Amino acid sequence: MNIAYRFRIYPTEEQKILLGKTFGCCRFLYNQMLNDKIREYEKTKKMLKNTPAMYKKEYPFLKEIDSLALANVQLHLEKAYKNFFRDSKIGFPRFKSKHHSKNSYTTNVVNGNILVESKRIRLPKLKWIAMKKHREPAEGLRLKSVTVSMEPSGKYFASLLYEGYSCENQAAGPDYSTAKILGIDYAMQGMAVFSEKVETEEAGFFRKNEKRLAREQRKLSRCVRGSHNYELQKKKVARCHEKIRNQRRDHLHKLSRKIADGYDAAAVEDIDMKAMGQCLHFGKSVQDNGYGMFREMLDYKLAWKGKKMIKVDRFFPSSKKCCKCGRIKKELKLSERVYHCVCGNKMDRDRNAAINIREEARRMLTA
């Protein structure tokens, strides 16, 4: 199993120039290769098998950067095509924009060309770069590749991908009829409601910083596009977004770790977050609480410990079903936040749904 560690790096001005050139060359090569594939298919109805080496003679500036970064461009383009042919909903590979694409490139470990020390990292063409290594990777891992990226705020990061990470073995598995399973139901307020009490911090980081972000964006709108002040203010806006994103990710990492450590399994409803944000006009709430990101984090952290995350069918009547007697209501409006049943059960509708999700997952595991 692979595991990645992300560290901040501090390149010199000379190294920043070379990094910028590498980002640009990778983007340029990706667009050129994609364009040639499209043109060849339009002419011959066959897929062109082009490689980075085919472009170095015509564009000699490609020789100035790491050749492995260019090789990974080819791999990324081929993966984009495979994803498209596997599922057309993903969409056809798109050209990368200079102003809206992520600035990053990936290089591989070959013959010791990458070295990692406590306070620095050596990369091809860049030599040694200062790095803040805030944690040590697990022992016994082998470095596979490094992805260098630049955030809109101007910060640089190196993501080190290691292979050989071993998950905790739970081959026997617990007795799921009595195992500790946590049911999780999506909620607009607070991201999720659990089948039992789980201490968590209040989320909604975007709304907490919304006024400050709006103020910085207003200042940006008054600046002349392309001016020095415009570029400075643009970075301030980017730092606001970065802070919100970091707060959200930190909160979700801590919460998912607590659940993965404390439970044998977790059960969630298999809902389409993208469709929910578009159809129910709750886009801001859906994106702010990061429920989709939380599910991904919880899934791989449970897998690390040899545990399971069970996805209950989205059409399972978790909200309409009474968790006490099992009766199912014919209708339940979204505005009804408290669940009432003829058996006398009265509780928060999301809590009722979370309990039903937990018990349905237990049934699925013991079936």
What are these regions, as identified by a protein language model?
Residues 1-367:
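Nucleic-acid substrate recognition interfaces
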